[in-house]
């Protein structure tokens, strides 16, 4: 069954690391972010990079992403379930209390579901202090941008991410599982994901047979 696996959570919770490792263990899987659609569409249409967000709509990107999922056996996508608009790196002048918005719309989920693609949303749970500590360490090692300016900032982000993840599950179009990335290694998390995916697929097959 074609599958989209979303792996989300707060900054530095381990999303990309788990996505990369899962891709190694799931046959015929690819890593692809919806956001990449902006640039792939731009390349196809010869749109300059500085005009990407003016000339390409979110609906176009959604449709592109659905097409990627429909043409792939398994798509693994590390995501932020919630973001503060116009903020992607640390800025000490930013208002950390500004509203978060969902990155995964109901319309996108419906479009994917209509293609009979199974959607699994994983939430990586990690304490705000640990996430903030990891982000600072990551910046010190490779100068990679970080977005949180304090543990309070990381706490607000964590709560927003989990709220939007729960809202996605409430649509009834998505199955999901919450995993602890603070106390489990990437290898252990990978094993837990694979076990969940196998169990979920078995339940889906039983449900289909029951409905026939």
Give the residues covered by each predicted segment.
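Small-molecule kinase domains that catalyze NTP-dependent phosphoryl transfer to phosphate-bearing small molecules
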Residues: 137-192, 203-212
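P-loop (Walker A) phosphate-binding loop of NTP-binding proteins
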Residues: 10
């Amino acid at each position: 069954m074609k599958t989209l696996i979303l792996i989300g959570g707060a900054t530095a919770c381990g999303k990309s690391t788990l996505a990369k490792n899962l891709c190694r263990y799931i046959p015929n899987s690819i890593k692809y972010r919806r956001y990449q659609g902006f640039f792939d569409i731009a390349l196809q249409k010869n749109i300059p990079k500085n005009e990407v967000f003016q000339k390409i709509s979110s609906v176009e990107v959604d449709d592109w992403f659905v097409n990627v999922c429909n043409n792939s056996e398994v798509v693994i996508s590390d995501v932020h379930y919630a973001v503060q608009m116009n903020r992607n790196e640390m800025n000490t002048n930013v208002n950390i209390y500004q509203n978060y918005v969902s990155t995964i719309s109901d319309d996108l989920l419906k479009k994917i579901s209509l293609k009979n693609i199974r959607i699994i949303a994983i939430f990586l749970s990690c304490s705000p202090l640990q996430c903030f500590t990891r982000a600072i360490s990551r910046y010190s090692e490779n100068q990679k941008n970080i977005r949180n300016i304090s543990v309070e900032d990381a706490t607000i982000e964590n709560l927003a991410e989990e709220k939007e993840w729960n809202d996605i599950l409430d649509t009834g179009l998505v199955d999901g599982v919450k995993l602890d990335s603070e106390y489990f290694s990437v290898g252990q998390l990978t094993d837990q994901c694979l076990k969940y995916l196998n169990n979920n697929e078995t339940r889906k097959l039983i449900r289909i047979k029951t409905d026939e």
